[in-house]
Amino acid sequence: MQKKFVLAIGVAVALGACHSTSYHSDEAIVEVPFTEVHVTDHFWAPRIEVNRTVSIPSAFRQCEINGRFDNFALAGGLIKGEHKGDFPFDDTDPYKIIEGASYSLAVKYDPKLDAYLDSVITLIGAAQEPDGYLTTCVTNKCERLNRWWGSKRWEKLNSHELYNSGHLYEAAVAHYQATGKRSLLDIALKNADLVCKDFGPGEGQKHVPSGHPIIEMGLAKLYKVTDEQKYLDMAKYFVEETG
């Protein structure tokens, strides 16, 4: 019995020691930047390399085949034609792939991929309207998709306009952190400034939720790289407005 009692005390002391060094709720949680993470094992490293050499180029090729890039070129007045695709959120395909490609550049620099991203970002910049607005099906006035976006910008919650913006922001931050280039980041900030102007609790602003979560995360990331409080406030507004 005495041995059991001593053992119990020992376990209690050990647990107490563990508790004293555990995480405290008032401590900030800071993620490890992806630019500082490099996987070199024999399982994941080869797959990451396949992603760089096969998957990412294939994904961009699908954007070329399915008109994702053409929509940006059309919105920018670089080509003539009709808007392609069946959804208002097709713009996010290039954004998502740019984000992934940026992670890849941080792992292993690829000058060909870097230059390709520059060319895609040029198209995206051409499609952006002077005040920062960026959703190609709206700029291109694609009547086929009116059931999604209506007849003017910001008209319907299910338009995915803010969803598009959120993925743009995430791609822009990843590209900036991986390359140091501001080309896509400046496009994203111009769009975010428009969102901060048009949405919110103030008079004359749209008092609505985002319609589809992702812009909240994107705005928070913009805040982290710019230290501009308005982006974090905008993210908080959308979260609270959603309820």
Residue ranges and their predicted role:
Residues 15-17:
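C-terminal motif of bacterial Sec signal peptides marking the signal peptidase cleavage site
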Residues 22-243:
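Glycan-recognition and catalytic cores of secretory/periplasmic carbohydrate-active enzymes
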